[in-house]
Amino acid sequence: MTQVSMRDLFEAGAHFGHRARFWNPKMAPYIYGKRGDIHIINLEQTVPMLNDALNFLSAVVGNGGRVMFVGTKRSASDAISEAASRCGMPYVNFRWLGGMMTNFKTIRQSIRRLEEIEKMAEDGTYDKLSKKEVIVLEREREKLARALTGIRSMKHLPDVLFVVDVGHERIAIQEAMKLGIPVVGVVDTNNDIEGVDYIIPGNDDSVRAIRLYVNAAADTIEHAKAAAAVRGGDNAEEELAEAISQEEPSAAEELPDDMADNENEFE
């Protein structure tokens, strides 16, 4: 499994929190001190907590679970989509639509609407419409695509949320809490830890730090999927061998009746 060191975090600037006057007292256990007016996050706490979170993701994915990456602010958007796409997981990186999980049926309808418009563009339907109608449809398509691209192939609710900036993504966390979905979250010094099951104390604004978190998660997920595939292959071979052994007749069964009774005559 991927391991992130204190040096990795330090070099990415993960230790820089927010201005002290904006702090959330619930983050006090994870704050080392202040540099000027900036809170400094205790990376000695972050390292084991991040690795615990990665272990959790590995266990979930190893058992066939799905992780949804969530990070919609500008500094996180690209990193979220790239990391999630690389490890084959759903993501939300533009805007969290209210009810994206708690009203998933409606979201699926929106995805079908997006697919319907795309089909219209491809099958020649646009050619039969007025220019104004095409413009309206294209605007709708662009709006839906921005919000839904990362979850288009998601048929079921995720098993875990991996969130960058839990304050910015508070609605997503509230929905996860309602549904009992565990949350792994990067929590800066100004945010509330409520609803976050696996806390990763760290800078949630630095692009470099964000890439470190999400790439570590993606690497962990890829390794877990590969390990699960190997286990599945091994199990498949064992099951096949067992099935064959059950179907094959014993040596005595293969012998003619008049010889079966004498099969051990040379022992």
From Swiss-Prot:
Keywords: Ribonucleoprotein, Ribosomal protein. One of its GO terms (cellular component) is cytosolic small ribosomal subunit. Residues 234-267 are annotated as: Disordered. Residues 250-267 have a biased composition (Acidic residues). Signal peptide: none annotated. PROSITE patterns: RIBOSOMAL_S2_1, RIBOSOMAL_S2_2. CDD domains: RPS2. It comes from the Bacteria. GO terms for molecular function: structural constituent of ribosome. The keyword Ribonucleoprotein applies. One of its GO terms (biological process) is translation. NCBIfam families: rpsB_bact. Belongs to the universal ribosomal protein uS2 family. PANTHER family: 30S RIBOSOMAL PROTEIN S2 PROKARYOTIC AND ORGANELLAR, SMALL RIBOSOMAL SUBUNIT PROTEIN US2M. This is Small ribosomal subunit protein uS2. It comes from Dichelobacter nodosus (strain VCS1703A).
